[in-house]
Amino acid sequence: MSTVLSVTKRETGHRSTLTQLRKGGAIPAVIYGYKLDSTPISISAKEFKKSIQKNGQNSVFSLDLEGKKVNVVVSEVQQCSLKDEVNHVDFLAINMAEELEVDVPIKLIGQSVGVSEGGILMQPNLELKVKVKPAELPDSIEVDISSLKVGESLTVAEIRHQTPVEIISEDDYLLVTIVAPVSAEQEEVSASVEEEQV
């Protein structure tokens, strides 16, 4: 069952209006999508944060908009760069019977053999794009890295058929790689080369 969040329609106006909203403990937001025109709303910052911590950002929420329930997912969250606060939220209204294309976080599990041997784990991409019905939307996609050795990598092609949802990302989309550590000798050589170039 979706978590219900109460929201209120708001007037679009000056920056001072948005500042006043935030000072009052609310977050300016907008809802758009399935059978709904773009509608400016506000939501309790406390309730939004609590729901995200409990359910995860990739959950389906039910917004109570003036007595009307609207199923949504969080499309975008704008964070304040100086404080750990949410500045604005975009909600996407959805049809529960139709598949969505969304980005889902990658969750690495297991201890890599390569890391145990001194290798360095590199994760160039933190999310995967998937196609899934809202009710089946996962909080994350688990990727087992325990067998990875130094010099080895893992791409979408190697996990595509092990994942319960359809992955849209290309086969060569890199998930994780284990690189060899830089030795003290290599660092000295690199430093001396840089000095010669100077």
UniProtKB/Swiss-Prot annotation:
Keyword RNA-binding in annotation: yes
Gene Ontology biological-process annotations: translation
The organism's place on the tree of life at top rank: Bacteria
UniProt keyword list: Ribonucleoprotein, Ribosomal protein, RNA-binding, rRNA-binding
Keyword RNA-binding: yes
CC annotations in GO: cytosolic large ribosomal subunit
MF terms (GO), sorted A to Z: 5S rRNA binding; structural constituent of ribosome
Function: This is one of the proteins that binds to the 5S RNA in the ribosome where it forms part of the central protuberance.
Family of the protein in this entry: Belongs to the bacterial ribosomal protein bL25 family. CTC subfamily.
NCBIfam families: bL25_bact_ctc, PRK05618.2-4
Complex and partners: Part of the 50S ribosomal subunit; part of the 5S rRNA/L5/L18/L25 subcomplex. Contacts the 5S rRNA. Binds to the 5S rRNA independently of L5 and L18.
Name this protein carries in UniProt: Large ribosomal subunit protein bL25
Name of the gene this protein is made from: rplY
